[in-house]
């Protein structure tokens, strides 16, 4: 009926974000923050993180070939080593790279497509989040679905995507899973990509501690498009779809395990991180092949301070 349809439109979706997963409470008034809700993220249906993040004031994520990008948060668009340490990318309040390690394209390792929320922090945050947050930070909150959803999409240039999510609750345990897989032939010659992201979540209570645990894995296999060169090349419509570097590629995977134990004013967040990438640097003389990887383990300990008088 019209009444029930109107009522459904006015239902406000509730998204629960714990204090431990969020960076807003930790940063306080040191900058300016914006939160993209799950509803906003779903409405955008972004095929690249830039399509959602560029809705945030003071943010510009410049899309490169495939899933590559360059980020600006109240700053210039920084490239190469100049972008290292400028922005911190986090999942559930935990940086996805150790301090001092950098990949300026890190957003493709975060499941922004199915996030419970995405927090964007504008302004210096290195004192709280570590040395990788000179200009700001982007934090993705992992969802724990309570219902099953299957979505299929198709688009131009051989684009296809499948999104799955589901959850189950048994006693004091709640389990959730999300998966998104996308393939594209690319707008230009030999510039397609295949990308998959999987998250598994578990919520429970242990001796008075509220426990949230997540396992996240990502995989990207990308054929990279090189720069089209030539005077006024932009005026030649035939050049727009060409790729002068069909040999260029970027293959990357990541695996993260993290947990959040909260009780009273205390929050403990142990984590394990592993990532590996190989990509042909077609933009440099000699086209060197870069291969990098990192493994790290740690724990963040937080204690809230009461301001009551």
Locate predicted features:
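Short, acidic, small-residue-rich periplasmic hinge/interaction motif at the N-terminus
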Residues: 6-42
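Short strand-turn segments of transmembrane beta-barrel domains in outer membranes
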Residues: 86, 124-125, 136-137, 142-168, ...
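Non-catalytic regulatory/gating segments with a bias toward low-complexity or hydrophobic composition
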Residues: 41, 53, 118-119, 138
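Transmembrane beta-strands of outer-membrane beta-barrel pores
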Residues: 154-158, 168-172, 181-185, 206-208, ...
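Extracytoplasmic beta-strand/coil segments of soluble accessory domains associated
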Residues: 50-94
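Hydrophobic, lipid-facing positions within transmembrane beta-strands of outer-membrane proteins
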Residues: 13, 69, 134-136, 150, ...
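Flexible loop and strand-edge segments within Gram-negative outer membrane beta-barrel domains
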Residues: 184-191, 195, 210-258, 275-293
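Short acidic/polar hinge/loop motifs at secondary-structure boundaries
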Residues: 94-122, 140-141
């Amino acid at each position: 009926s019209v009444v029930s349809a109107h009522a459904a439109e006015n239902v406000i979706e509730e998204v629960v974000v714990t204090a431990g997963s969020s960076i807003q409470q930790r940063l306080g008034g040191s900058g300016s923050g914006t939160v993209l809700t799950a509803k906003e993220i779903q409405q955008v249906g972004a095929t690249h993180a830039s399509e959602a993040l560029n809705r945030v004031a003071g943010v510009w994520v410049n899309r490169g070939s495939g899933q590559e990008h360059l980020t600006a948060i109240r700053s210039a668009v920084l490239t190469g080593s100049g972008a290292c340490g400028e922005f911190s990318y986090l999942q559930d309040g935990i940086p996805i790279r150790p301090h001092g390690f950098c990949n300026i394209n890190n957003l493709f390792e975060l499941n922004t497509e199915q996030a419970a929320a995405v927090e964007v922090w504008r302004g210096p945050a290195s004192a709280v989040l570590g040395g990788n947050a000179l200009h700001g930070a982007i934090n993705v909150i992992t969802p724990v679905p309570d219902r099953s959803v299957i979505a299929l999409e198709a688009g131009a240039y051989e684009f296809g995507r499948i999104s799955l999510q589901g959850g189950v609750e048994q006693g004091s345990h709640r389990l959730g899973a999300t998966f998104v897989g996308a393939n594209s032939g690319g707008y230009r010659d030999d510039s397609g990509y295949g990308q998959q992201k999987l998250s598994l979540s578990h919520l429970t209570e242990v001796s008075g501690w509220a426990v949230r645990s997540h396992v996240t894995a990502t995989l990207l296999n990308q054929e990279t498009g090189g720069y089209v060169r030539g005077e006024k090349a932009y005026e030649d419509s035939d050049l727009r779809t060409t790729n002068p570097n069909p040999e260029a590629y970027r293959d990357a995977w990541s695996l993260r395990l993290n947990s959040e134990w909260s009780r009273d004013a205390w929050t403990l967040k142990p984590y394990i991180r592993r990532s590996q990438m190989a990509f042909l640097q077609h933009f440099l003389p000699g086209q060197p092949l870069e291969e990098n990887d990192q493994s790290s383990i740690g724990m963040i300990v937080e204690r809230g301070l009461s301001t009551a008088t």
